[in-house]
Amino acid sequence: MKRRIRYMALVLVLCMLALTGCAQPRDTMTVRVCLDAAPATLDPAMASSDAERTVVAHLFENLMKLSRGEDGSIQPVYAAAKSYTVEDNLDGTETYTFTLRQNVRWSDGQTVTAHDFVYAWQRLADPATGSPHAALLDMVAGFDQVQSKQDGSLLQVSAPDDFTFVVKLSYKCAYFLTDVCAGTATMPVRSDAAEREDWSLHSETLLTDGPYRATGWDETGLTAQAADGYYDARRLGPDVLEFRFETDGQARADLLSGGDVDFAMNLPEGDTSDPYPQTTLLLLNQRTGSLESESLRRALALAIDRNALTEGQPLDPAQGIVPPGLRNTMGGDFRQGSGSLVDNEPDNYEALCQQARTLLEEAGGVKAAGQITLLYDSTDETAAQTAAAVQDAWKQKLGLIAILRGATAQELADALNQGEFMVALTTVTADRGDASGLLSLWESGNGYFYSTAYDMLLRAADASGHVEVRDAYLEDAEAMLVEDGWVIPLYYVHRHSGLAQQLTAPLYDGTGVYRFSAVVRQAAQ
C-alpha cells in the first residue's frame, strides 16, 4: 500500500512539472543579421556572393553539415545523411554510399529523396546550367565527360532507391565530405521546382529542405523561421533569423552599434577579423622564356616590402600562397600549421634588399634582366596602387625598369588564360575551404606554368591515405612555387565583422559563409 502511495505521488509530481513546463514556454529567440548585399538568387548552384551563400546555408540542408570540434577545427557531421560507407575500388577510385534520413522534408511537406541529390549534382555539373561552382565536382567520376559532351547525366551519381545516394570518385578526395557534401552549391534541388522560371527569387516559390523556411523576402531583407518538424530542432539556437540587406559598410556598422542588428558582416572596422579565401600575388609567366633565371625571380620577390603595401588597409602581408582560414586535412588552419614562406619582419627588409641585389648580379645585372612588363587591373584602385608600389620598389632597390600595363578585369583574365603576359598582378580565390582549392590553380593546363614535379606532388597528395602525409605534399607544392620565384605572394584580404555581446559567435567556414543555427544567448556576466 505504501509503495502504491509513493508511486502515485511520483506520478503527480511529474504531471505538475510537465504542466509547469507547458505554462512557461521559452522565449522566442530572434537573431538579426546584416548582410552586405541583397541576394540576386538563392539557387544553390548559382549563389556566389557571401550573402547569397550564407542565406542558402540556412534554408537548405546537404548530406553533411559543418561543426566546430573541441580543438577548434571544422569537421563534417551528419545532416540529411544519417550514415555513409566508403569502398576502395580496384581501379583506384572510391565509391561513397550515403543512407539518407527518411524524415527530412521539403518546405511543401514532401520527403527529400536521393533522387533530389542526383538531380542537383548532375544539374550543377552540366555546362548548360552555367554554374560558377561546377568544378567543385571535378573529383566525381564522369565530370570530364560531362564537360566535353555537355551532358550532366554522365556524372556518376545514382539513387538505387529513395534513400540511398551513391557517388563514385575518380580519385581519393580528402575534402569531399567537408567542402562538397557540406557545401552550399551541392545542396539538394527538386526538379519540379528548379524547372520553373525564377523559382529561387521569391519566398512563395522557393522550395527548401533546411532548418529554416523563408517566410518573407523583399529588397530590404529576408525572414526565416525554424522549420516545423526539422529532425534536429533541439540543437537549433535561433527560432527566427532576420536577414537585413545593406550595401553601405558604415551603415552596417551604425546598425550594429545602435542595437538594430545582432551581427554585421564586412565592416570597415569590427570586433573580429575574419580570414578570406583570397590572395593577391604576382604571377611570373614561365612560358615567356624571359624570366628563366631563378636568381632574377628571387630578386624580384625579395625587393618588395609587403608591410608598406598593406599599411593602413584591411590587408595582411602574405606568408605564402594559401591564406589563413583555408583548412588542412585535419580541419585545422593550413597556414598556421605550415608556417611562413616569406620573411615579413620589418627590421630585415634592407638586408633582404641587399640579398636581392646580389641575386640580380648573379643573373647578369640590370642589363640582362631587361625591361619587365607588369599587367594589372587598372579599374581596381587597390590594384593600381599596388602595381605602382611594386614598380617603385624594383626601381629604387634594384634599378630595374618595369612598365605598367593597365587592363580591364576581363582583359586581365583573358591574358592569364592565354598566357599573354610577362608578370601579372592578380587576386586568386579558392572555390573550396581546403588548401588545395588554391594550389590546384598551378596544375598543368594553365597558360603560365608547367611542372611535372609540381603535378606529381598534387597527385601524391590526392592519393595519400594519411592526413599528415597529404599535408606535407601540399606544403612542398606551395614551397616550390614560392621558393622558385614563379609566384610572389603579396597580401591577404580580411573581413571585419561585429557581434552583439550577448550572443555566441556564428560558425565561420573561412570562405565567406557564416552559419547561425547554433548561436545562443550567453549567460549574463
PLM-predicted stretches and their roles:
Residues 344, 400-412, 437-501, 525:
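Extracytoplasmic/peripheral linker and loop segments enriched in polar/acidic and small residues
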Residues 35-91, 207:
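N-terminal lobe/hinge region of extracytoplasmic solute-binding protein
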Residues 219, 349-353, 358-428:
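Ligand/substrate-recognition segments at binding pockets and active sites
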Residues 68, 169-240, 250:
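Gly/Pro-rich hinge or "lid" segments in bacterial periplasmic/extracellular proteins
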Residues 315-362, 380-383:
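Structural transition elements
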Residues 113-120, 162-166, 239-240, 277-325, ...:
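Alpha-helical secondary-structure segments
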Residues 99, 116-118, 133-191:
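Surface-exposed binding/hinge segments that line
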Residues 499-525:
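Long beta-strand-rich cores associated with HINT superfamily self-processing modules
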